[in-house]
Amino acid sequence: MTGQELAGAEVEADVALAPLTTLRVGPVARRLITATSTEQLVAALRAPVGRDALILAGGSNVVLADDMADLTVIRVANSEITVHDGIVRAEAGANWDDVVVTALAHGLGGLECLSGIPGSAGATPVQNVGAYGSEVADTIRRVRLFDRRTGRDDWVTPQDMAFGYRTSVLKHSDHAVVLEVEFALDVGGRSAPLRYGELARALDVEPGGRADPVAVRDAVLALRRGKGMVLDEPDRDTWSVGSFFTNPVVTTADHERLAAEVDGPVPSYPAPDGVKLAAGWLVEHAGFGKGYPGDDAPARLSTKHALAVTNRGHATTADVIALARTVRDGVRTTFGIELTPEPTLVGCTL
C-alpha cells in the first residue's frame, strides 16, 4: 500500500475507535485510513486494502463491537461545504451542525429543526435523519454515491433513495458509500413548517406555521440540551447515540388494544402505515425510568431522556447491548411491541 494508491490519505496502525464514536465504545482497528478529501476517500475505497473496510464518519449513530479482528477502517473526513443559488453541497465528512449553521449564515431555511444533531452530513441520508417534525428527505436534492461493487460514483435523486421513517436504501447496504449531499433550501429565509407541538409552543407558533429559522435553531438547541441530546464532554448523559430505538409504527388495532390496557392517554401520531407511538413513553411505562438501572451501572439510561442508552465513562459495548436488550425485551413483555434499534450495530446484535 503506497501513499499514491490512497492519494495521500493518512494511514495509522492499532488505533482505538472508542474516542471516534459518541458512545465511546468499540475495538482497536488494525489499520485506520483517514480521508480528508473526496479524492482520498474514493482512492481508499478503490484500493485493495479498502474494499472490505468499515466506513466511519462522525461515529454518532453506530455501535461497534468490543473486538473485531483484523479490522481496517476508512474514516470519512472530507468536510467542504459550499453554497450556490439556494443549494448547499456538503462533503460526506462535514460536521452536520456546521452544515446547518452555514445554511443559516446564507439566509437559507429548511435545516434549522435538525440543529444540534451530532455526526456527519454523509450519514444523514442513510437513515433519513430527522427531529422535531423535519427530516433530511424534505430538502435533499441529490446524493453522490460510490458503488464499491463497480468502482463508479454517481449522483442519485431522492426517488432513488426510497426514503422512509429513519431509513433509506442505504441503511442496509454495504456497497454504497456517500461522498457528497446536496440540499435545496428556502431562499426566502423561511423555516421549515413547525410540525412538532413542543417546538411550536416554545416559539408561540401554530403547528404547521413558520418562524425565523435562527430563532427555531435556538429553540431546538434548548430543547435538545434539556434532554442531554447536545454533545458535552463532561455530561455523561450525552455519551450516547441519541435515541437508541425508533418510534414504533403499529396498526390501529394494536394502538386501540394498548390504549385499553393502560391508564391515561397513549402518546401517538398518525403515520402512513398506521399509528406511530412514542418509544420513550413505552420504555418508561415498561418500568425503565430515567437513570435505569442506577448510579453504579457502567451503562444506564440517560437521567434526562429514557430513550438514550449512555456510557457513564467505563462501559463496554457488551454493557451497552445488555442494557438495550433488557429494555427492548421489557417493552415487548409489557406491551407486545417490538422496539427497533436506531443506530447501526456492527459486529454485535440485540
Curated annotation (Swiss-Prot):
Keywords, in A-Z order: Cell cycle, Cell division, Cell shape, Cell wall biogenesis/degradation, Cytoplasm, FAD, Flavoprotein, NADP, Oxidoreductase, Peptidoglycan synthesis
Enzyme Commission (EC) number: 1.3.1.98
Official protein name in the record: UDP-N-acetylenolpyruvoylglucosamine reductase
Catalysis performed (reactions): UDP-N-acetyl-alpha-D-muramate + NADP(+) = UDP-N-acetyl-3-O-(1-carboxyvinyl)-alpha-D-glucosamine + NADPH + H(+)
One of the Pfam families matching this protein, by short name: FAD_binding_4
Organism: Mycobacterium sp. (strain JLS)
Main location: cytoplasm
Cellular compartment(s): Cytoplasm
Catalytic center residues: R166, S243, E342
Entry GO terms, CC: cytosol
Matches recorded under HAMAP family: MurB
Listed InterPro entries: FAD-bd_PCMH, FAD-bd_PCMH-like_sf, FAD-bd_PCMH_sub1, FAD-bd_PCMH_sub2, MurB, MurB_C, MurB_C_sf, Oxid_FAD_bind_N
Main function: Cell wall formation.
Cofactor entry: FAD
FAD-binding PCMH-type domain span: 25-194
Family affiliation: Belongs to the MurB family.
